[in-house]
Amino acid sequence: MKVLFAGGGTGGHLYPGVAMASELKKVVPGVEISFAGTPAGIEATEVPRLGYPLHLLPVRGLKRGRSLRDLAANVGVLKDFGSSLMQAFSIIRKETPNVVVGTGGYVSAPLLLAAQLSGCKTLIQEQNAFPGVTTRMLARMASEVHLSFAESRKFFGDSKNVFVTGNPAREFPAEPRQACLDFFGLRGDLPTLLVFGGSRGARAINNALLRFCGRLEGKINLIWQTGSLDAERVTAEVSSSSTRWIGPYIQEMGKAYGAADLVLCRAGASSLAELTNLGKPSVLAPYPYAAADHQRHNARALVNAGAAIMIEDTNLADDASLETILDLLGDSERLDRMGHASRSEGYPGAAAELAGRIIALSKS
């Protein structure tokens, strides 16, 4: 059995494919797995590190502006897409995959299209509440389309090939809360706020925390992943203490989640999948410049479910936002309700279920 995963650019489009690949390796002895991506994406370094073959295509994303510069750049983008499509046909002929799985990002488009035109089975896995351009364009020709949010179903009418299976995410073993707090050197008698904005960080979130940090001292525990870009600036102003753990990156994310009563973060699909699988209540600050504003759509899905509240990026440093967070941390009953609502939105078996669908398609 051969499976080709096409997607990347960011971890949010790559790691769902990695999770499905890991599940396939568990249940299909001798399965041959390869990936396709771009030289500029995270997959260029991460996929070889994981030991999978990688095909690189020159495809780029379209500029969304209307300036002459953007229009001129898009001429080159279309040329690169044509070249990538020809390479994709060559990859399909050479690899002869049983199934091509698209996990989003512009790199998935030429591989999915070439596979569909070659008569190869295709599965699209859409992470975001508002489906991406590739998903919307190629869904009708796909063998199956799998969504992460139930509310995304409305974009596909009565299509019989569309299913809601959740977003494959990292799995974390359950650990006692006190043991997790001890790991970070924090007090057991205070509620804990976990804050992160991705591996590079989120400047608006970090700025808000810098403004409020002194007022949080002694009221809550804080686990704060600053990201690599802001680490030096933040640690120059604020240091760790008995109620604060501050660092550029959290290696033991399972322990951070285990300690957390509330999470403040962006609204990327992978983060939300982890939150809902673990049943964590959250305060979401969608990245305002995400393509098609997809993070806002993701956040709205959890807000509508009662699992989260949303704060606009521009309002993060307002006193009202601080009061909202402190009020939540002081209301254990509301946190419990939000946690139950969050868990009801999770799909902890998503990777295994999707691996099963890939296997079924390969045999059909």
From Swiss-Prot:
GO terms for cellular component: plasma membrane. Its EC number is 2.4.1.227. It catalyses: di-trans,octa-cis-undecaprenyl diphospho-N-acetyl-alpha-D-muramoyl-L-alanyl-D-glutamyl-meso-2,6-diaminopimeloyl-D-alanyl-D-alanine + UDP-N-acetyl-alpha-D-glucosamine = di-trans,octa-cis-undecaprenyl diphospho-[N-acetyl-alpha-D-glucosaminyl-(1->4)]-N-acetyl-alpha-D-muramoyl-L-alanyl-D-glutamyl-meso-2,6-diaminopimeloyl-D-alanyl-D-alanine + UDP + H(+). It comes from the Bacteria. Its main location: membrane. It is a peripheral membrane protein. Transmembrane segments: none annotated. SUPFAM superfamilies: UDP-Glycosyltransferase/glycogen phosphorylase. Pathway: Cell wall biogenesis; peptidoglycan biosynthesis. UDP-N-acetyl-alpha-D-glucosamine binds at T10, G11, G12, N128, R170, S199, I250, Q295. It is an enzyme of class 2 (transferase). Pfam families: Glyco_tran_28_C (PF04101), Glyco_transf_28 (PF03033). The keyword Cell division applies. Keywords: Cell cycle, Cell division, Cell inner membrane, Cell membrane, Cell shape, Cell wall biogenesis/degradation, Glycosyltransferase, Membrane, Peptidoglycan synthesis, Transferase. InterPro entries: GlcNAc_MurG, Glyco_trans_28_C, GlycoTrans_28_N. One of its GO terms (molecular function) is undecaprenyldiphospho-muramoylpentapeptide beta-N-acetylglucosaminyltransferase activity. One of its GO terms (biological process) is lipid glycosylation. NCBIfam families: murG (TIGR01133). Belongs to the glycosyltransferase 28 family. MurG subfamily. Cell wall formation. Catalyzes the transfer of a GlcNAc subunit on undecaprenyl-pyrophosphoryl-MurNAc-pentapeptide (lipid intermediate I) to form undecaprenyl-pyrophosphoryl-MurNAc-(pentapeptide)GlcNAc (lipid intermediate II). This is UDP-N-acetylglucosamine--N-acetylmuramyl-(pentapeptide) pyrophosphoryl-undecaprenol N-acetylglucosamine transferase. It comes from Chlorobaculum parvum (strain DSM 263 / NCIMB 8327) (Chlorobium vibrioforme subsp. thiosulfatophilum).
